[in-house]
Amino acid sequence: MSEIEEEEEEGSASAITGSRSFDLPDELLQVLPSDPFEQLDVARKITSIALSTRVSALESESSDLRELLAEKEKEFEELQSHVESLEASLSDAFHKLSLADGEKENLIRENASLSNTVKRLQRDVSKLEGFRKTLMMSLQDDDQNAGTTQIIAKPTPNDDDTPFQPSRHSSIQSQQASEAIEPAATDNENDAPKPSLSASLPLVSQTTTPRLTPPGSPPILSASGTPKTTSRPISPRRHSVSFATTRGMFDDTRSSISISEPGSQTARTRVDGKEFFRQVRSRLSYEQFGAFLGNVKDLNAHKQTREETLRKAEEIFGGDNRDLYVIFEGLITRNAH
């Protein structure tokens, strides 16, 4: 018995010595078995417990990390969808911007076109306003100078065309003198005296125009269309043409031309200038009438010849107003002679 006790004491002493060498606490050494194999078995169990605990902790931590990763992935997907929506909005905004730029360019071109149209219309309105003022002044002058000057000469008793002689029983119907259309002169004849029909007509004075109405004269057609009948017909046909002009044209006067033509008619036809211009205004457009006025003004200002004036007048009147051109041509041609 004593030997066994000694061995146990030696074993415990060696265990204590080993614990001291491994720095194990005394409490643990007291509960450890003395057999080394049993100590290894205890150590294995302790290691298994430690590993199991560590693995459980790591698995728990891994699960938490997976949950956090899932949340981050979800946030990433949300952010990615938001980025895609923003990119779509940006693309739509660029498309709208390009459309707005194109519309802006179209509006700029349209604005420029409308501005040009407005300027052109303003110029047309200014021209029409000036034309209207000219017509109003002409009509006012026509109203103030009521009636046109009439020159009617007494024919000779025989049938041949003889010069007219003024009658003693002449009556003055107009208080303003009438001047004839001055013929157009060339550029080198500007200093020459300008002939006028008033020099060849038997006018009483330059301020009054007598109307010579001899007894026994045939019917006379005046501007108003009222015939004045007499008792004795004659064979020659005499035309008294009165040419009324507007302000700024033919120097604001009315010109009368007496034309003697052989024939068998027994009446005198009188073409009134005022009525002629009314026909011209009513039958021509504003542009044509303005061109006609400018043509006559150029003739009076000696800027063009009589032939050029007639050519332009023929283009203005055209084929539909051939009668007006014939009257105008007769007035200018006879005045030149």
UniProtKB/Swiss-Prot annotation:
GO terms for biological process: ER body organization. The modification N-acetylserine is found at S2. Residues 50-130 form a coiled coil. GO terms for cellular component: cytosol; endoplasmic reticulum; ER body. The keyword Acetylation applies. Residues 170-182 have a biased composition (Low complexity). It comes from the Eukaryota. The keyword Acetylation applies. Residues 1-20, 139-242 are annotated as: Disordered. This is Uncharacterized protein At4g15545. It comes from Arabidopsis thaliana (Mouse-ear cress).
